[in-house]
């Protein structure tokens, strides 16, 4: 996580991960523009609960509308991608201003959610479910 001067503008970057999704979030001061894979944020993430979940770090730190966000996200589905976006935004906000650490840490936004899909085992119907057992 490096701070760099990109065309004389302070740019901060954070990488977020969730399930099999990876999001790279670039934050710089602006008017609140949010682009995900060169598309508008609302058209990329259409479910309202996923949208609010992804933007919750900005709401908690009272920075919604103060920064422009450019996000590249790939892998997984829309739920994993929005979780990765939330993780990336949190890391970038922490890099931008370290006073955000306590707020983000207490809500668990800086912690990587390590839950993944458990693999199916042979001799069983699913990961944990067994085939139906018949005594006779």
Swiss-Prot record:
Gene3D superfamilies per UniProt: 3.30.230.10
Keyword match Ribosomal protein: yes
Cysteine pairings via disulfide bonds: none
GO biological process: translation
GO cellular component, one term: cytosolic small ribosomal subunit
InterPro entries noted in UniProt: Ribosomal_Su5_D2-typ_SF, Ribosomal_uS9, Ribosomal_uS9_bac/plastid, Ribosomal_uS9_CS, Ribsml_uS5_D2-typ_fold_subgr
Keyword Ribonucleoprotein (UniProt): yes
Molecular-function GO term, any one: RNA binding
UniProt cross-references to Pfam families, sorted A to Z: Ribosomal_S9
Key words, A-Z: Ribonucleoprotein, Ribosomal protein
HAMAP family referenced in this protein's UniProt entry, alphabetically: Ribosomal_uS9_B
Classification via NCBIfam families: PRK00132.1
Family: Belongs to the universal ribosomal protein uS9 family.
The protein's name: Small ribosomal subunit protein uS9
Source species of the chain: Borreliella afzelii (strain PKo) (Borrelia afzelii)
The gene coding this protein: rpsI
């Amino acid at each position: 996580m490096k701070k760099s001067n990109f065309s004389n503008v302070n740019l901060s970057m954070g990488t977020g991960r969730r399930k099999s999704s990876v999001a790279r979030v670039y934050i710089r001061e602006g008017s609140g523009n949010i682009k995900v894979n060169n598309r508008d944020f609302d058209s990329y993430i259409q479910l309202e609960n996923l949208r609010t979940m992804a933007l919750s770090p900005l709401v908690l730190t009272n920075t919604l509308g103060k920064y422009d966000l450019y996000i590249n996200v790939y892998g997984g589905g829309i739920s994993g991608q929005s979780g990765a976006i939330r993780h990336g935004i949190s890391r970038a906000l922490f890099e931008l201003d370290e006073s955000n650490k306590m707020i983000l840490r207490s809500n668990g936004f800086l912690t990587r959610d390590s839950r993944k899909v458990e693999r199916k085992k042979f001799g069983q119907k699913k990961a944990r479910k067994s085939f139906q057992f018949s005594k006779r």
